[in-house]
Amino acid sequence: MKKVDLREEWYDDKKKVSVVIVDVTESARKLAAGHLCGPVSAYYLAKALASAALLASETSEKDEALSIQMKCTGPLGGFNVECTADGALRGYTEKKVLDEFDGSPDRDDRKILGSQQIQVTRSVPGRIISQGISGSIDGYLAGSLQRRACIYLSAETNQEAEVLHARGVLVEALPDSKESVSEFIPERFDIPACELLAQMGLPEAKPVKTATLRFECRCSPERAVAMLGALDEKERAELPSEIDITCHMCGRTFTVKTDETR
């Protein structure tokens, strides 16, 4: 049976706590393979995609997209991921191969990421809806959005850089809730949503919405041709007869004949 990435939204009316659960394993697997990621970058890409899928649960406009850009002082360099309102995921890490760390199963954030700055942007074509900067996703939720919420992420890759799983949970205590959001911590991510919620202490939570997610990029051969066509005539004349253009968001490469741009 073909596996499908999902986002599930649940709500416990008694405790006034909402939970969003995502599984982006298939999208992360395809993107990591497309970028030729090593095990470490595949791991962090998987967790970043889960974060974007969680935060994008609140996108409302038809063409809206939520992006997370992270810059860090560690060797990974950062990442850029995006999830659209209709569930399309794409993204990349700055470094794809980390020779010093790829041979080890350890994922030490302090060594691989160092200090971080995260920018979360919600936008539609031609307009930014909102933007926030923080040192972490939880910091963005608490600081920029003033919300009592926490994100929990889980990812696993093997030494062949295959993503084995990529999942996430966003827990939020609503303003009229008397609960502390830190009380609801998932211990396992490899179980059905209803079991995970019971494990977290929310057995009475009810499903609100389910949406499918997928890897999809807006790049195309036509966009590649248009990009070269935007160069001035002198610049195009200096190009070889064929040129390869790689999309940095998904790793797909297009071979363009430069005479197509004239």
Give, region by region, the residue ranges found by the protein language model.
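Cys/His-clustered metal-coordination modules, chiefly Zn-binding fingers
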Residues: F184-R262
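Interaction interfaces in information-processing and related assembly proteins
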Residues: M1-P207
